[in-house]
Every structure is written in structure tokens, then in C-alpha cells.
């Protein structure tokens, strides 16, 4: 791998608090986002991702004040998502201190928004979040066996997740945040098949998310094609040096880390 693997803690925020659940359900309080952001910055995180997990499903804006306070505490790139619908929200997030914006539900509903945002700000600003799950029994199967979900994993779309990643890359997204809804919060490891399929379909960087439970889970995701690895529970509820442990595991597997 030509560039160093990035390790990214994820702050899933609901009503101004960091939360974590399993398969996006049963949310548990994990702390104050500003305090956690400061801790992860000091602990060696390469970037932070801040997702307002109910902004899209509740049809409300991201909590911009929390974004601003978080951005004031960290000196590493901050990606913010949740409730991003177009150029106006991205512009506001950047003014409040975000470095990149993540979009999911709005892009599925209107793919042209990807072109509009990247034309306005450049590809490097836009991350496409793909919440993918294996197609359910009784539902129409997709070609890859994975479908795109929206509204924080609550709604299936019937859209093939691999084809959607390919289309978004062709439209100009800078990165793909690939989250396995099936693995999310389970601590059983990343969905390696999903990562491999998307890696074969796109050339843009992939951030693998969903399922990390111990440092040993991270190297297989990198080997499958992830350029960065993202997790929440393992960092929120694990020892304070967990970022360092994860980087050590990746390095010992033969991959470069920052």
C-alpha cells in the first residue's frame, strides 16, 4: 500500500451525546463528543469522523454548535455527516470547522447532488457514506448480495451497494466510508467480503467501518483493500491506548501507519 493506513475513531452523536449501539439499534451513551475528540486527538488518531446519527431520520440539521466546539478541540482532519443534503449544508459545515462532509441518504435520493458538491468544493471535501447490508431473505436480491440502506441503516433501498459505490466514484466523490450494517457494533470483525468487492470496483480511498472488536480485526480489513479503518466501540469503551494498540497490530501485519 503506497500511503500510510489511517486510524479513525467515529463519534456517533445523538442529541449532543456520543452513542453506540448494535446494528444501529439500542443506543448506549458513550460520553461528550468534545471530550472524546480531544482524547482521541491526543491519543494518536489520524482523523475523526462525526456522524449525527439521527439527523437524516429525524429530518433535522446536524448539531452545528457541537461541530464547532469539536473542531476547536482537534488538530486533525474532521469529517462530519448526518443531515447533509447539498451545497448549503457542506458550506456551513466547512465554516463551522469541518474539513470534509459525509453524505448518504440525500445522495441516494438524488445522485446529482454528488456532482454539485464536488463541482463547488472539489472531490477532496466529499465522503460518500455507504451503509451496506446483505440482502434479506424474501427481498429482491442484488447482483452482489449487498444492498444500500439509508436513514441510519433503517431503510433498505434495493440498490446494489457495489454498483452505487462505483457510480459515486465516477461522479467524483473523494472517499467512500463503507459501513457494514450487519457487522456494526457486533465486535466480531469487519465484513471482509464487502471490502474486497468495493475495492475491486473503485479506485478512490475506502474507509472500512463496522465490526471491529479487537486490534487483530484491523489488519484483515487493510489486506482486503481498506485505505483507512474506522471504529467506535473499541475506542469509546476500551483502554485509553487502544489507538496505539490498533496501529501496532496493523504495523506488525506489514502495513505502514502514521
Swiss-Prot record:
SUPFAM superfamilies in the record: Ribulose-phoshate binding barrel
The protein's name: Imidazole glycerol phosphate synthase subunit HisF
Keywords: Amino-acid biosynthesis, Cytoplasm, Histidine biosynthesis, Lyase
GO BP annotation list: L-histidine biosynthetic process
Function recorded in the entry: IGPS catalyzes the conversion of PRFAR and glutamine to IGP, AICAR and glutamate. The HisF subunit catalyzes the cyclization activity that produces IGP and AICAR from PRFAR using the ammonia provided by the HisH subunit.
EC numbers on record: 4.3.2.10
Matching Gene3D superfamilies: Aldolase class I
Catalytic residues identified in the record: 12, 131
Main localization, broad class: cytoplasm
Enzyme kind, highest EC tier: lyase
Highest rank taxon of the organism: Bacteria
Pathway it works in: Amino-acid biosynthesis; L-histidine biosynthesis; L-histidine from 5-phospho-alpha-D-ribose 1-diphosphate: step 5/9
Family, as annotated: Belongs to the HisA/HisF family.
NCBIfam families: hisF (TIGR00735)
Assigned GO CC terms: cytoplasm
Reaction(s) the record says it catalyses: 5-[(5-phospho-1-deoxy-D-ribulos-1-ylimino)methylamino]-1-(5-phospho-beta-D-ribosyl)imidazole-4-carboxamide + L-glutamine = D-erythro-1-(imidazol-4-yl)glycerol 3-phosphate + 5-amino-1-(5-phospho-beta-D-ribosyl)imidazole-4-carboxamide + L-glutamate + H(+)
Quaternary structure (record): Heterodimer of HisH and HisF.
An example Gene Ontology molecular-function term: imidazoleglycerol-phosphate synthase activity
InterPro entries referenced in this protein's UniProt entry, alphabetically: Aldolase_TIM (IPR013785), His_biosynth (IPR006062), HisF (IPR004651), IGPS_HisA/HisF (IPR050064), RibuloseP-bd_barrel (IPR011060)
Amino acid at each position: 500500500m503506497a500511503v500510510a493506513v489511517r486510524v479513525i475513531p467515529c463519534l456517533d452523536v445523538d442529541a449532543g451525546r456520543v452513542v453506540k449501539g448494535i446494528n444501529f439499534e439500542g443506543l448506549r451513551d458513550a460520553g461528550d463528543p468534545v471530550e472524546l475528540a480531544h482524547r482521541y486527538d491526543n491519543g494518536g488518531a489520524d482523523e475523526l469522523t462525526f456522524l449525527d446519527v439521527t439527523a437524516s431520520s429525524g429530518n433535522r440539521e446536524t448539531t452545528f454548535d457541537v461541530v464547532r466546539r469539536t473542531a476547536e478541540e482537534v488538530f486533525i482532519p474532521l469529517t462530519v455527516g448526518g443531515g447533509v443534503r447539498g451545497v448549503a449544508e457542506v458550506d456551513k459545515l466547512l465554516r463551522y470547522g469541518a474539513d470534509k462532509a459525509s453524505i448518504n441518504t440525500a445522495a441516494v435520493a438524488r445522485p446529482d447532488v454528488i456532482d454539485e458538491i464536488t463541482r463547488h468544493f472539489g472531490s477532496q471535501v466529499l465522503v460518500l457514506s455507504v451503509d451496506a447490508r446483505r440482502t434479506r431473505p424474501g427481498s429482491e436480491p442484488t447482483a452482489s448480495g449487498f444492498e444500500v440502506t439509508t436513514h441510519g441503516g433503517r431503510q433498505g433501498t434495493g440498490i446494489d451497494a457495489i454498483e452505487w459505490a462505483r457510480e459515486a466514484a465516477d461522479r467524483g466523490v473523494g472517499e467512500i466510508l463503507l459501513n457494514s450494517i450487519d457487522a456494526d457494533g457486533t465486535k466480531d470483525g469487519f465484513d471482509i467480503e464487502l471490502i474486497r468487492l468495493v475495492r475491486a470496483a473503485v479506485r478512490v480511498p475506502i474507509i472500512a467501518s463496522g465490526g471491529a472488536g479487537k486490534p487483530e480485526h484491523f489488519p484483515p480489513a487493510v489486506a482486503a483493500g481498506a485505505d483507512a479503518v474506522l471504529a467506535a466501540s473499541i475506542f469509546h469503551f476500551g483502554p485509553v491506548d487502544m489507538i496505539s494498540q490498533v496501529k501496532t497490530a496493523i504495523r506488525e501485519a506489514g502495513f505502514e501507519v502514521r
